[in-house]
A protein has these predicted regions:
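Short beta-strand element of the alpha/beta-hydrolase
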Residues: 56-68
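Serine-hydrolase catalytic-loop signature spanning alpha/beta hydrolases and amidase-signature enzymes
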Residues: 68-71, 93, 137
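Short amphipathic alpha-helix adjacent to the substrate-entry channel of hydrolases
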Residues: 74-96, 103-105
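Primarily recognizes the serine-hydrolase "nucleophile elbow" in alpha/beta-hydrolase
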Residues: 136-208
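N-terminal cap/lid segment of alpha/beta-hydrolase-fold proteins
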Residues: 23-56
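C-terminal catalytic histidine-bearing segment of alpha/beta-hydrolase fold enzymes
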Residues: 246-319
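Alpha/beta-hydrolase active-site loop
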Residues: 113-144, 237
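The feature captures the conserved acid-bearing segment of alpha/beta-hydrolase catalytic domains
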Residues: 178-249
């Protein structure tokens, strides 16, 4: 009798473990959302397996990879644990392709200021168009995927962060990009890992943006922390954007890492996951009007270079 009881107890325990493992399984599906000449653009959807059969619509994180508009992968292994974390928190995560226009351009064509400025603008425009097409694809499948199209959060790393921020900037200024999306659409929030906005002249916001979460190191030599300007065209970094948001009293969460470079384009996906969830729960889904700035100080980096020139940024991005 005793042995039988132990056997039954062990069987029940194994069944419970199997149930938990099954409940935590992440389902991944890949879809083609656009074909543009030689480029077939795909996206990967991640969702908790036990949420697929639910009835409640879920918020979505639309992620764009980094890679300097020269490369990168939507399924980079370094991103997957971040996607799974968000999926377990109740989000549908969509990681999208976009065309990387700088990969096929001879570096000699953008080695000078004007050439670099022109090539970068074209690459950003192309990436943002594809990001918008991925957004439309999600909206078109919102019923089938059981997602809430009013709760799509744009997210990106480095070049992908520029893409996500630029998409929001274009919507707020009612440009031709906004016409590609449904009427009155806006992202519910943006999470930027070392991003910037590309604008001719100082950025202007016709409409206030959605809540923004901006991670940036003030020693970043790849994407400017504050700004990098070539005549009229400039890349306006997280610090500059945050100053504008503060004046407009628009909700934001700005995370500054002093003495840190471009590693903030990926490290928050591991080190700041709960900060990200707090932003999503409070400022995005909870619609709290908060202006939050967190400064990470490192005593070991008391002396560091942060006054980069436009030439410094060009050299770094031509590697």
């Amino acid at each position: 009798m005793g042995k039988r009881f132990i056997f039954i107890l062990m069987a029940c325990s194994l069944l419970s473990i199997a149930t938990v493992v099954h409940a935590q399984h992440i389902d991944k599906q890949t879809y083609t959302f656009a074909i543009k000449k030689a480029d077939t653009l795909k996206l990967d959807k991640y969702v908790m397996i036990d949420q697929i059969q639910g009835t409640q619509s879920k918020p979505v994180i639309l992620f764009a990879f980094g890679g300097g508009f020269k490369g990168g992968r939507r399924d980079n292994p370094d991103y997957i644990s971040y996607f799974h974390f968000l999926a377990r928190a109740g989000y549908v995560v969509v990681s999208t392709d976009y065309r990387t226009q700088l990969k096929d351009i001879d570096k000699s064509e953008y080695s000078d200021l004007q050439g670099f400025s022109s090539a970068l603008q074209q690459a950003i425009t192309c990436a943002v168009e594809d990001f918008g097409d991925a957004t439309n694809y999600i909206i078109e499948h919102s019923v089938e995927w059981q997602i809430n199209p009013a709760q799509i959060i744009a997210c990106g790393s480095s070049a992908g962060a520029i893409t996500a921020l630029q998409a929001e900037y274009e919507i707020c200024n009612q440009t031709a990009f906004a016409d590609r999306l449904p009427a009155n659409f806006n992202y519910a929030g943006v999470i930027s890992f070392s991003g910037a906005i590309c604008a001719n002249g100082i950025p202007k916001w016709i409409m206030s943006p959605c809540p923004l979460m901006l991670f940036h190191g003030d020693a970043d030599s790849t994407v400017p922390f504050t700004k990098a300007v070539v005549e009229e065209m400039g890349l306006w970094g997280s610090n500059f954007i945050c100053m504008q948001l503060k004046e407009k009293e628009t909700a934001y969460y700005f995370y500054i890492a002093e003495g840190i470079g471009h590693s903030l384009s990926y490290s928050p996906m591991k080190d700041n996951r709960h900060d990200i969830l707090s932003f999503l729960n409070r400022l995005v889904l909870g619609k709290e009007k908060r202006c939050i700035t967190t400064v990470e100080k490192n005593p070991e980096t008391s002396r560091y270079k942060s006054d980069f020139t436009i030439e410094d940024y060009i050299r770094e991005n031509m590697r």
